[in-house]
């Protein structure tokens, strides 16, 4: 059985067509897709999962201007690739991300740097793929934003989150809206004003961290279990879940009309649901969507 990727209604970029051209082998991605290594990052793809590793451990995986631009390009590229279902972001070494690279000149290119960071967080926030932050260590400033702009976040118990900008006469200008959105006004304001370390256990209790692992090995297990669960989520349906969440969160436009458009499209002939429901009726309740026959054709 096959289904078409043609859509019957015009949707926004959050609702990409279902993926195809599945790549089943784990590998560094080829130069024809993206550079597998860059100045501060590495990229690995296995089946429908892309892993982006921040690889500036000597700088705490700090966000240089060039790294911010490269990450923006990666997320924009993967947003349009049918073979990508999920994007995992993590760090190499002790830190997840120590925020903006303060070793660079901040004042001469302030506007350029601000726009680059806004583009980065905007690209992750608008990405139709499921994004997962695997927080392997402490996060500061913009690194906190990187974690909490992602859809799902898991962390090691020894990590913490610190909005330390105020100590240097700065504030988390580019990430504040994501922190306030995910943490809530009260906690976000306190964290920004005091620069206190916020520990993962507290954020897990609030539901904004979705798992806390005891150590690095346990974090690997938690991550793989999560990715295994996500493998049963249909890619277009997942993108629609994100679009509906964004529509409700932003409170703009007619949500009911938007939901009706999605409903009509998701049950149309040639949709993911046609295949999924047919499999369910045959007694197959879990579909590994990367391996589904319908995804190999258009």
Swiss-Prot record:
Record's keyword terms, sorted: Lyase, Virulence
Segments for region (Disordered): 1-39
Pathway involvement of the protein, from the record: Mycotoxin biosynthesis
Catalytic activity: a (3S)-3-hydroxyacyl-CoA = a (2E)-enoyl-CoA + H2O; a 4-saturated-(3S)-3-hydroxyacyl-CoA = a (3E)-enoyl-CoA + H2O
EC number: 4.2.1.-
Gene Ontology MF term list: enoyl-CoA hydratase activity
Additional detail: Gene clusters encoding host-selective toxins (HSTs) are localized on conditionally dispensable chromosomes (CDCs), also called supernumerary chromosomes, where they are present in multiple copies. The CDCs are not essential for saprophytic growth but controls host-selective pathogenicity.
UniProt record similarity statement: Belongs to the enoyl-CoA hydratase/isomerase family.
Functional note: Enoyl-CoA hydratase; part of the gene clusters that mediate the biosynthesis of the host-selective toxins (HSTs) AF-toxins responsible for Alternaria black spot of strawberry disease by the strawberry pathotype. AF-toxin I and III are valine derivatives of 2,3-dyhydroxy-isovaleric acid and 2-hydroxy-isovaleric acid respectively, while AF II is an isoleucine derivative of 2-hydroxy-valeric acid. These derivatives are bound to a 9,10-epoxy-8-hydroxy-9-methyl-decatrienoic acid (EDA) moiety.
Name this polypeptide is given: Enoyl-CoA hydratase AFT6-1
Organism listed in the record: Alternaria alternata (Alternaria rot fungus)
